[in-house]
Design a protein with these regions (language model features):
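Function-determining surface determinants
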Residues: 1-154
Length: 154
């Protein structure tokens, strides 16, 4: 999992200032990680994007009292909508890894059936890649960036 960038906060820092700094950092983390997930053979790249989105939405929630509510809700809603297709692809990645482990230890008589399941999952994952590309593009969309900038500016 990609580490989040560190944001040093001080106890006397106003909530709005801290919120802006943390949201900006989480937004930059997402922007840096997301492009690497498109077409990656490493399923952890997609997982890292999902974690970065969760960190950003969590920051929006944690600092809610220091942010303009309508702008915060709009940005959060856009993030969740744009990242939703990543969940299906990640689920398939996890299932494929699990079935591959089963296949390695399977009896010869079971291998054909397990291989078929693996092929079906791999096909579904290949189809999901188009949704991953669209989701990553949406997470880099200027409209979302503007919504996050609006939250950080309030």
């Amino acid at each position: 999992m990609a580490p989040a960038s560190t944001v040093e906060l001080s106890p006397g820092e106003p909530l709005r200032v801290a919120a802006r700094r943390v949201i900006a950092a989480r937004s930059e983390d997402l922007a840096a990680i997301a492009p690497g997930a498109v077409g990656s053979s490493d399923p952890e790249a997609l997982h890292d994007v999902r974690v970065a989105v969760r960190r950003l939405t969590s920051a929006l929630d944690v600092f809610a009292d220091g942010l303009e509510e309508d702008a915060r809700r709009r940005a959060r809603r856009m993030l969740r909508r744009d990242a939703e297709p990543l969940g299906r692809a990640r689920d398939l990645d996890v299932q494929i890894a699990l079935v591959r482990r089963f296949l390695k230890g399977a009896r010869t008589s079971d291998q054909a059936g397990i291989s078929h399941v693996l092929a079906v999952l791999a096909s579904e994952r290949a189809e999901a890649e188009a949704e991953v590309k669209s989701a990553i593009a949406a997470l880099a969309d200027p409209e979302l960036r503007a919504a996050l900038d609006e939250v950080a500016a309030t």
